[in-house]
Amino acid sequence: MYQRLRNLREDHDLNQTAVARVLHVSQTTYSRYESGTLDIPSAALIALAEFYHTSVDYLLGLTDDPKPYRK
């Protein structure tokens, strides 16, 4: 999961500070999410999935299909 977060961020040409702002956390906190040293709250996972237009299942590694769910 953590590698997917980094890959998505890099694919969107973003730095950790930019993504941290989306989540309203510090860059240090986001860095810890991305490295796996801090568990990501479910609200942050949902926010990341919406931000990247993907599903939480994709972020968690439960699927390899990055497409979001239909609403």
Predicted regions and their residues:
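Short, charged recognition helix plus adjacent turn
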Residues: D11, L60-K71
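Short, basic-rich loop-to-helix N-cap that marks the start of a DNA-contacting helix
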Residues: T37-A47, P68
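Conserved hydrophobic/aromatic packing and binding residues within compact polymer-binding modules
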Residues: L5, V19-A20, Y30-Y33, L59
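Hydrophobic side chains within well-formed alpha-helices
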Residues: M1, L5, S55-V56
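Short basic helix-loop element that most often maps to the first helix and adjoining turn
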Residues: Q3-V22, A47
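DNA major-groove recognition helix of helix-turn-helix/homeodomain DNA-binding modules
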Residues: H24, A43-Y58
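DNA major-groove recognition helix of helix-turn-helix
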Residues: E34, Y52, L60-T63
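Recognition helix of helix-turn-helix/homeodomain-like DNA-binding domains
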Residues: H24-D39
